[in-house]
Design a protein with these regions (language model features):
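Short, hydrophobic/amphipathic alpha-helical patches that form generic packing surfaces
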Residues: 119-127
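Terminal low-complexity "docking" segments
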Residues: 2-115, 129-130
Length: 131
């Protein structure tokens, strides 16, 4: 498989892993309507523009917070105010809403599940680096 073909598969791999992450959160909090809303919104975005989520992840998560991700610092992500990170992004309010839809339940998880959530963040960042 050529390098170009491998790169074309990266967004699919990333999106599948991201969907798995959200599904795991849904499993822990099956009655949380906000998580289901985030899941549906991300699914819609993925169908409309499969590369959008990974590009946002690279620019706004993986690159600026590489050190915190590498350290596995879940508390950083749970407490951080992201509003200034998306000032230049035209849908910043929507992104902040989705972040909070996912972050709030993670904040309410036990340590073991928070560690799993952090592992997802680390894995997603590693996958994104391959693009």
């Amino acid at each position: 498989m050529s390098a170009a073909a491998k790169n074309q598969n990266i967004p699919t791999i990333f999106n599948n892993h991201f969907a798995e992450f959200i599904n795991d959160i849904c499993t822990i909090f099956p009655d949380n309507v906000r998580i289901l809303s985030a899941k549906n919104a991300l699914s819609t975005i993925r169908r409309a523009n499969p590369k959008m989520i990974i590009k946002i992840w690279i620019n706004y998560v993986a690159t600026p917070y590489e050190n915190q991700i590498d350290r596995g610092d879940i508390s950083f992500f749970l407490e951080k105010d992201y509003s200034s990170d998306f000032v230049d992004y035209n849908q910043s309010d929507n992104i902040m809403e989705y972040i909070n839809m996912l972050r709030d339940p993670i904040r309410n998880m036990g340590q073991e599940n928070q560690a799993k959530a952090m592992k997802y963040i680390q894995n997603l960042s590693k996958i994104a680096e391959l693009l």
